[in-house]
Amino acid sequence: MKRFLKKTVLNELINTRFPICKTRPNTSNNPTTSFVLGIVNYRGQKFLDGKTKGPSKWNTIHPKLFQLLQELIRSFKPDFQYTTIQVNKNTQCKPHIDTNNVGDSYIIALGNFTGGDLVIESKKFNIRNRFKRFDGHLAHWVEPFEGDRYSLVFFTHTFKPPIRSLANLKITEKAIYDKDNKLIKEY
C-alpha cells in the first residue's frame, strides 16, 4: 500500500504546476519552485483584511495532492501532529534552520534523482522514498543532486495562538472544521 501511495503521490507531483517562489531567502539564494499546503501565515498579502493565518490558497488549487499528502504521512506515522506541508520541486536548500517550526518535522524525497541527501549538522541521510524525522532548529541542508527531486516537509508552525493539528482537521477555502465536521473557524 505504501509503495503504491508513494507512486501515486509522485505521479501527482509530476503533473503539478509549481510556482516560482521568491520569499524563501533563508533556504536558497535563488528562487525556488515550491508552495505550502495546510495552514499558513499570510505575509505581505494586503487583500486579506488584517488576517494573519489561515488555509493556504494552494489547498484548493491542488486538492487531490493535498489529500494524497495527508494520506501519505498518515500511512507512515498515523499519530503525527502537523499544521503545514512544504512542497518543493528541485530545491537545493542551503544550510538553514526553521525558526517558525515547533517540535519535530518529517521529510521525504520522491522522484528520479541521484544525490540530494538531507544533511543535518554534517550528518547525511538518504531520504529518497523514506521518511526522516528531524528537528528543524538544527542546521540542515540538501546535498547537490541530478534529476527531478520532490521533497515534502510535514511540520507544525509556531502560530500564535496555536492551531490544532492538520491531522485532525478538514480545511476548505473559507473555513476549518474538526474531524466531526464541526466548524472551528471561518475566514
Indicate residue ranges for each PLM-predicted region.
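Fe(II)/2-oxoglutarate oxygenase catalytic core
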Residues: 1-131, 137-187
